[in-house]
A protein has these predicted regions:
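A short, conserved structural fragment
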Residues: 44-55, 313-323
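Non-catalytic C-terminal interaction segments of nucleic acid-processing enzymes
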Residues: 2-3, 8-9, 13, 22, ...
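Leucine-rich, amphipathic alpha-helical/linker segments
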Residues: 83-113, 349-396
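Short amphipathic alpha-helical interaction segments
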Residues: 2, 30-45, 299-314
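Active-site metal-binding core of divalent-cation-utilizing nuclease and nuclease-like domains
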Residues: 52, 95-162, 375-385, 393, ...
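Short beta-strand(s) of the beta-wing in winged-helix/HTH DNA-binding folds
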Residues: 21, 47-50, 66, 290, ...
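A short acidic, leucine-rich amphipathic alpha-helix
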Residues: 22-30, 291-298
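Accessory beta->alpha helical hairpin/"wing" motif in late/C-terminal subdomains of nucleic-acid enzymes
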Residues: 53-79, 321-360
Length: 499
């Protein structure tokens, strides 16, 4: 195949930014969509590029393209450099490909951000980061650079705070764009990024993926004013002292993306459907979930649920354990690794906390024999755990029936809030946190499922953390509204005693 200068430019763009779709490639190359579609078809016929499918809750199904081994060799030849140099200086090696495939859903959102920025600034570039605190660096005109940081769904407060601390110590960018999964964590991140050295802007991941370039969805670390992406990037200053990442020591030409690779861990983001990814997120949030409860949270029937679970079972992503005659669902170690790598968190820590695997293979199944510390605790108190799951299913079902939207439903490890009261660090540890969007506005609440708080001393101990929390200004600061505390009782007797 003969390559024209425009073809070499398109291949070079895919070498710098693998797994762009056609529309994103058109926006970043400055060529028409029709021309890009035509050239991609020719590249596929010549074996210069390969493609994978990708879809998520925030990104509609699309095909994403990357250079094949033949494409890497051809681009190196056209640019007059050894292909080994191309492998070490651009993210086209097999090692880089696997890393980006593991983060494909996150990469898709960041590419949407870059596509929006290309509408008002050109030329525009993006450099992926392998181990730096930022996910990528957006290269603007006039030597300006903006760091892009995505906070994943499974990232905990401590891990993200460490990333932000490292980011502030990393030179080379004049602004920071932080993408957060929900309003609560956006407000927490806003406190972390406030202050020098670079100005920071934050937005919800859903808004970044679905809103247009002119939508005012970006917020500064202080003040309530919302800015468009153009306005936010207008504050980016030229940066100096950039510290480049150390290149990979061992690189190799990319392997073909054969159908046999679909079971590989790094291919899961391309192999899984949106519904399957949603099911994995819910099982990850609520370990030991009953299949019926999962169906209610997903809003699907029994037949569809059976199909989803069969597929996840086949890929080895979930574990089914029978306890008291009822099946319970949890993420397998492989499923935990999939979520951890998607969100740039530690696989080892995820397994240490949540693994359902037995500590002793010969010991009978029991909560004492579960290796994950938090999974063990939830299984030990399974009656309470299932009660909270049951309440969640009722909430999700009623929200759908009444035309409301369940915006946020956080499990205990994300629902906890930490604050200072009388110079001491305090916390509230609810069973869940929910945010529901109704016709009359947003309603938020902490859930407390009560079975034993029937004695005065016990009741006081349960309510004291909330009284301290609401005595500060943090509830409004953390949520943008005042959440209620919803106490649910198992029977009328417990309710009477509590009240």
């Amino acid at each position: 195949m003969r390559l024209y200068p425009g073809d070499i430019e398109l291949l070079g763009t895919l070498a710098r930014m693998p797994f762009l779709d056609r529309l994103e490639l058109a926006a970043l190359s400055g060529r028409s969509r029709a021309a890009v579609y035509q050239r991609i078809d020719r590249f596929l016929e010549a074996g210069l590029v390969e493609s994978v499918g990708q879809a998520s809750e925030l990104v509609t199904p699309t095909r994403r393209f990357c250079l094949s081994a033949r494409g890497v060799r051809r681009l190196a030849s056209e640019e007059g450099v050894p292909f080994a140099q191309l492998l070490s200086t651009r993210p086209v090696s097999e090692q880089w490909r696997r890393l980006l495939l593991e983060r494909l859903d996150a990469a898709a959102v960041i590419y949407r951000l870059v596509e929006q920025a290309a509408q008002f600034t050109f030329p525009l570039g993006l450099r992926w980061q392998r181990a730096a605190p930022m996910d990528a660096v957006l290269e603007l005109t006039e030597g300006r650079r903006a760091a892009v940081v995505r906070q994943g769904r499974t990232v905990d407060r401590t891990g993200f705070a460490k990333r932000i601390r490292r980011l502030k110590e990393t030179p080379g960018h004049g602004a920071v764009l932080v993408i957060c999964p929900d309003e609560t964590r956006l407000r927490h991140a806003r406190r972390l990024v406030a202050g020098p050295p670079a100005i920071a802007f934050l937005a919800l991941e859903r808004d970044v993926a679905l809103a247009g370039a002119e939508a005012a969805v970006w917020r500064g670390p202080t003040g309530a004013a919302r800015l468009t992406l153009r306005e936010a990037l207008g504050y980016a200053l030229p940066a100096s002292g950039e510290r480049s990442e150390r290149p990979l020591v061992r690189v190799s030409l990319p392997e073909p993306l054969d159908p046999e690779c679909a079971r590989a861990l790094w291919m899961l983001p391309a192999a899984l459907t949106t519904a399957e990814k949603r099911a994995l997120d819910l099982v990850g949030d609520w370990p030991w979930l009953r299949p019926g409860h999962l169906a209610a949270l997903l809003g699907v029937g029994r037949r569809r649920l059976t199909q989803l679970l069969a597929r996840l079972d086949e890929l080895g992503l979930i574990t089914r354990l029978a306890r008291a005659g009822a099946p319970q669902l949890a993420l397998s170690d492989r499923g935990l690794a999939y979520l951890a790598r998607r969100d740039r968190t530690s696989v080892g820590i995820a397994r240490k906390r949540w693994s359902p695997e037995p500590r002793g293979s010969r010991d009978p199944f029991d909560w004492r024999n579960v290796s994950g510390i938090r999974s063990r605790q939830l299984l030990r108190n399974l009656e309470h755990t299932e009660s909270v799951h049951w309440f969640n299913t009722l909430l999700a079902g009623q929200a759908r029936d009444q035309g409301s939207r369940l915006v946020q439903l956080d499990p205990p490890h994300r629902a906890s809030r930490y604050f200072r009261s009388h110079e001491r660090l305090r916390s509230v540890q609810p069973d869940a946190y929910a945010l529901v969007e109704t016709a009359s506005g947003e309603q938020a609440f902490f859930l407390e499922w009560e079975r034993r708080a029937v004695r005065p001393a016990t009741m006081a101990a349960r309510l004291a953390p909330y009284l301290r929390y609401y005595a500060t200004g943090r509830p409004l600061e953390d949520h943008g509204l005042l959440p209620r505390v919803l106490v649910v009782f198992e029977d009328q007797l417990a309710a009477d005693h509590f009240l």
